[in-house]
Amino acid sequence: MRHKVSGRRFDRPTGQRMSLYRNLVTDLLNYEEITISEPRAKEIRSMAEKMITLGKKGTLASRRRALAFVYMPGIVEKVFEDLSKRYAERPGGYTRMTKLGPRQGDGAEMVKLELIK
């Protein structure tokens, strides 16, 4: 029984799964909106919000933690310079999920995950 076991495995080894999360979070922070399946969106939503919260802290340690997670250093600059100012007054909830319906090929529920303007 898997009572109180959080997180999804997506039928991948840990390294591949973490790489998938890092790529999706990097894309979300870069393009500010992505269309993905609902379970994936639910997994990366909290990670993206944590990156923005690190940007709002603005310390050297938080910048290094963000650089360790996000693949492209330019995205970290964007988070610390632009997004941290945009969400300075907002205490959390930087993302929005909008349901788009099932995907044609396999019927997976698709959502648009976007950063709130």
UniProtKB/Swiss-Prot annotation:
GO cellular component, one term: cytosolic large ribosomal subunit
InterPro entries, per the entry: Ribosomal_bL17 (IPR000456), Ribosomal_bL17_sf (IPR036373)
Lineage: superkingdom: Bacteria
GO biological process: translation
Gene3D superfamilies from the UniProt entry: Ribosomal protein L17
Keyword Amino-acid biosynthesis listed: no
Subunit structure: Part of the 50S ribosomal subunit. Contacts protein L32.
NCBIfam families given in the database record: L17
Name of the protein in its database record: Large ribosomal subunit protein bL17
Gene: rplQ
